[in-house]
């Protein structure tokens, strides 16, 4: 734990942060607006869990968006990515991100789990169901009906 590879201490890992946002949203649905916590810690500001979840999601999304100077945190100090029009809008979904400045670090070929950012963007800015809600909804859908025999004895598909 103290030495060697420190990848599991400090960087921003999207799967864990995504799960945190999701569970905070779920707890907010249960506890409502009356249950608040101090956020950020030491600020004296009380927010309900939905507000905390939204803030965390926005911070994750901001890693990919351009700031007031047109720079993206995910590109860090790589000037080619920050300034070249051929590269600036080609986002990097790396394995994990620097905990202080949001720069993409880790393997660039392990992008699958960073793709959860698409769901957070959709939920924060698209006003649509989360993927979990969609899966729950379609999981509870009635089973398709079996074909009914026709007068000629052949099965006919019921829409």
Locations of regions flagged by a protein language model:
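Acidic, mature catalytic/reactive cores of soluble proteins
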Residues: 1-159
């Amino acid at each position: 734990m103290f030495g060697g590879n420190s990848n599991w201490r400090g960087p921003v890992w999207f799967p864990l942060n995504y799960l945190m946002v999701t569970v905070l949203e779920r707890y907010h649905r249960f506890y409502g607006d009356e249950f608040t916590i101090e956020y950020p810690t030491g600020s004296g500001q009380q927010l309900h869990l939905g507000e905390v979840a939204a803030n965390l999601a926005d911070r994750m999304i901001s890693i990919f968006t351009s700031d007031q100077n047109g720079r993206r945190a995910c590109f860090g100090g790589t000037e080619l990515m920050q300034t070249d029009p051929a590269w600036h809008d080609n986002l990097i979904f790396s394995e994990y991100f620097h905990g202080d400045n949001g720069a993409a670090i880790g393997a660039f070929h392990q992008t699958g789990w960073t793709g959860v950012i698409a769901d957070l963007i959709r939920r924060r800015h698209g006003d649509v169901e989360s993927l979990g809600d969609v899966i729950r909804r379609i999981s509870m859908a009635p089973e398709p009906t079996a074909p009914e025999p026709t007068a000629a004895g052949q099965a006919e598909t019921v829409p």
